[in-house]
Amino acid sequence: MKHFYIILISLMGMASYGQTTKGVVVDEFGNTIENAYIVNSNTDSHAHTNELGMFSVDKSQVGNVLKVSALGYKKLNFTVNSSEVSIVLEGDIFRLDEIVIQQQLSALNVISKIDLETTPVNSSQEILRKVPGLFIGQHAGGGKAEQIFLRGFDIDHGTDIAISVDGMPVNMVSHAHGQGYADLHFVIPETVEKIDFGKGAYYASKGDFATAGYVAFQTKEKLDKSSISVEAGQFNSLRTVGLFNLLGNQKKQAAYIATEYILTDGPFDSPQNFNRVNLLGKYSAILNDNSKFSVSASRFSSTWDASGQIPQRLVDNGTISRFGAVDDTEGGKTSRTNFNASLSKPIDENTFLKANAFYSKYDFELYSNFTFFLEDPVNGDQIKQKEDRSIYGMNAELNKKVKMSDWDASFQLGVGFRADATIDTELSHTLNRSIILENIKLGDIDETNMFTYLNTELKFGKLMINPAVRLDYFKFNYKDKLASVYKSQSETEVKVSPKLNFIYSQNNNLQFFVKSGIGFHSNDTRVVVENNGKQILPSSIGADVGTIWKPFPKLIVNSALWYLYLEQEFVYVGDAGIIEPSGKTKRMGADLGLRYQLNDWLYFDTDATYTYARSIDEVKGQDYIPLAPDFTTTGGLSFQNWNGFSGGLRYRYLKNRPANEDNSIVAKGYFVTDMNVSYEYKSVTFGVSVENLLNTEWNETQFATESRLKDETNSVEEIHFTPGTPFFMKAKIAYKF
């Protein structure tokens, strides 16, 4: 290990090889362009711009011609006139044939860029659906974080997927409702600039919860124009959005304010009374040394009522409709306030530092009743889950590239921490939201995660080898406020997560990859201290083998075979306040996706996933993993700027899947289609969108639950579900200025 660090330090200090042209690529407004592709037509040497738009091309000199291309920009032949250049690209229509498959671990991110360009998001739910193979479901009146499904995982609300926005974590550790709870509703969809995602645990910069994968959202640095829009639709639905550019199109600085307000009663017999308010302010600047600095503040709050999950037997016998309720006093309220500052600083043409620091204030209060009168035949089983949380944190990463005669290397050294302080994390048995019948759990939680990682990319021509390692330190502390005497419990744990990936790029149109790595998700502090720190950071061990292929200029295909093993663990059940074991599991599957541009304005995309998911230690036939997706597919046609018209037709299909361990109860699948169309005339856009175009009867979320109704003697275990949205039409008008 000592010799390794000596070699590393030596490499990072070496000078570039041969003559070099270095520079930056920007658009007409001065915004830096990431992942632009630069090729020296005289020597065939090439490079990509980094996050700051900077590049360095070796074997290049004055008089050479650089061919520069980037998705969404016109190609440019640039004649080198000095050793340092600034290249300006002009915006253009989206062209799939301009895509270059890059020799990097996150090469698949080009898929999300394509999808954002061709099918822009207009709801917070659609943001997560941009990740191929990821399904979501809402089952609490619109205010609760979505239930997530990916790679054979019922991720619940985020246990096995790490989600972040501008470097701020979205997942909540030791949350009152469930571990990893990730409420993304504070993001205004129109402000999303980039979606970075990866499946599996192969990324050193991603730690806690990144077992099935990660999703990292990046908001816009600036707005081209200001705009206001109003949407109105069925079920007393209203949404207004305001985007206000405060500084115009200055090249060195930008500032904007974004607002969103949503009201709806939903299709339910008992109105949801849902409302949500979002506010975001962001300032960005390019400093004299080409550093990029930004600071943002946001506020989100939401309240709602919910009909809850209903038992199939009541719908079958006609007692209630699919949109009825057993206990319509469910619901809740939540809020989140964020402050975030980030800096990307170039040190030289091959080195830069990026860092961000953040603070979040979060409140949550949820009322649920999943079992009705099973535990309390008189008052019912309603529960309250509540918490008041503060989150502090920082991420920093040093990036260094080294160019040798016949191979290149790059290094990312990262450090950071996250500290959560939660006051009065509560689970109580309640009546009609107003009376606390029993405090089941009540306490304060302090949890700290400090980490470091080293990621290395060694490029030998067409082959890139990517060894990496991550080190995480956790400290858990719980103060039980229901104990008769003062009781504060604490545990610490260290986790080492190695990764090893291979990427072979045959050319700019064909890439093969083998990825492998160990990841983990943390467990609730209440599990950690009660289980004396044992089996609290279960490992996931996984591998992917796949390709990214561009057989034709306007067609890109991605495919992968994968395997994932998850260790046994003990988990905290937030709805019951108990700890139960979760056995070892294995998942394997296949992913396939394609993107095709039929002409300048018409696009087609589809993704399909197959998964085989089983518990390892259970006997055959009793080893199904409840709600694990088996087969899924999504896709659609979209068109952009065809004589002023834009729109699309999309579908999503989720196959029937087991709802319990022996598959005796089945969660029914669904096939749902959505449609939207808009027309832009000068500065005004008119649009119509329809969810569930064919008015399909489907269950958005469903569980095998044992419950008892007030007039029942015995309990019944069966499907309890939240119905999916029926035919739902909205109209929209927007004005840009």
Residue ranges and their predicted role:
Residues 125-172:
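Extracytoplasmic beta-strand/coil segments of soluble accessory domains associated
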Residues 234-263, 268-307, 331-348, 405, ...:
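Transmembrane beta-barrel wall of Gram-negative outer-membrane proteins
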Residues 604, 656-657, 679-737:
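C-terminal beta-signal and adjacent terminal beta-strands/loops
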Residues 197-204, 213-247, 259, 267, ...:
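Short strand-turn segments of transmembrane beta-barrel domains in outer membranes
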Residues 55-58, 169-199, 218:
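Short acidic/polar hinge/loop motifs at secondary-structure boundaries
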Residues 344-346, 352-370, 505, 511-519, ...:
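Membrane-embedded beta-barrel scaffold of Gram-negative outer-membrane proteins
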